Amino acid sequence: MCDIVPQNKAFVPAITAAALCAALLSATAQADLRPEPVPGGVAEIHVAAAGNPRPEVRFDGRPVLLRQRADGWHAVVGLPLDTPVGEQTIQIGPEGNSRAQTFVVGPKAYPEQRLTIKNPKMVTPPADELARIAEERERQLAIRSRFRDVPVNRVDLDLPADGRLSSRFGLRRIFNGEPRAPHTGLDVAVPTGTPIRAPADGVVSLVDDLYFNGKTVFVDHGQGFVSMVCHLDQARVEVGQKVARGERLGDAGSSGRATGPHLHWSVYLNGAAVDPALFIAPPKAR
């Protein structure tokens, strides 16, 4: 779920335009997924040798994205933030005739972040909004869990807007002293009206104005690989529209639970929210 710009402006150092441009010139060609098999991370697992047809692979009962490399097929598995540390299992092959392959999930500690929200309804919503919030949650879950079986040639992503990275993925958030869901995206502080662009090719799967997220756009990149941008001032796309990498999805704003204009960007794999920084070139993420 989307959250807000942190009050602590020093949480992440500012990235200047000049430094960003220099980093892009040197790193664009190297951009690729950087697997990190931890809770909230991504595991990449070799599952079939070169020359074999694309296998079926599932994790926790859900189909996962397959990418083709020189040595064959690799499963790209999203790991939810509540994934237990230790040995995990994927199933390879059709249901009823599959084999198990194990991999190991390592530990990762995410920092705590305490924030003060002026509008108490955005911390503890009134009773007459609870049905709306529950319906929106279920609708978003369905959208991000959808598996559109199309080839995915690239799993690297572009940052949807250039700016100061103001809040990292996975922060354990406490609003007005009340523990709430962890931060499941990457925040970029940008002025209202800043163009927000598609991080990769895809199809727009949801455009809506949601209670917490505000104006929101989901883009389905295929095989359960989904991006979401929210807190927009306005959306400029429609459901079902095909978008290309870099195409404008909308304008940055502060709709929903936000104290100032910024981009919140979430990435999902096989239904799990994962760290978007793993999909962008390191100089842009760090």
Residue spans of the language-model regions?
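Bacterial N-terminal signal peptides
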Residues: 14-26
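N-terminal secretory signal peptides that target proteins for export/translocation
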Residues: 1-10
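Alpha-helical and His/Cys-centered functional microenvironments
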Residues: 11, 17, 266-268
